[in-house]
Amino acid sequence: MLENLRFSSSRIFFDSRMLKIINDNVLTTKYISNKSIDLIVTSPPYNVDIEYNSHNDKLSYRDYLNFSKNWLSRCFEWLKDDGRFCLNIPLDKNKGGQQSVGADLTTIAKDIGFKYHSTVVWNEGNISRRTAWGSWLSASAPYVIAPVELIVILYKKTWKKTSGSRESDITKEEFMGWTNGLWTFSGESKKKIGHPAPFPIELPRRCIKLFSFVRDTILDPFMGSGSTLIAAYLSKRKGIGVEIDKNYCELAKQRLIKEGKINQLNLIDVGINNC
């Protein structure tokens, strides 16, 4: 596959026949064509003061919603007319004030033009984010925190998918289990992966097999540690990741080699780090 590697820009971390990492800002990147993406699977910053290398995760809530509107608008442009969008976001948050994040981002997406299809509730199982209970053992001001996240399923114009290979690789057992809107599997370890907010490969794997065909193009505009690209590659889909931080691009590359079983020569030996 060495002959398939292309280096057209300093923003392209690597580009092979099946995978592309773009080291760029999702709001300004010019390296994704409009109406070229079959499925977007992503988990954007939650604005809960996580220490990313290259992103301010402590915006005012109004600024966070404006930021979300801007990147969601770009995703809308990139999707094909029968493209889908799996948006992993919190149900709500209490850091910096109680906010209905899931409802607010879904409303913004619909205002942009996305159509709503359904919501999967992800029971993370090992979630542990409690830092306060409000009024302890008192009705004066208790906090209620749901130990779940959402995967909001949106689409651009038509839900029925007619483009692509029309080849599905999902099993009967997977289809029956995953069309149930409650998914239960563990989250990912920050320490193990080396990223402050990784999500498990199982999440994009389910979304990719359920909502796309073999050889479709999958995009993660907040690639992070590369879970979506690994799932895409292992599912015989093309994967594109956008990531503003070069160190996370390198982390994703190393995970693709280790967990995606990518031939290391295809990613390293032709000057990929000269980006």
Please place each PLM-identified region on the residue numbering.
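Class I S-adenosyl-L-methionine-dependent methyltransferase module
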Residues: 104-105, 251-275
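Core catalytic lobe of class I
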Residues: 2-250
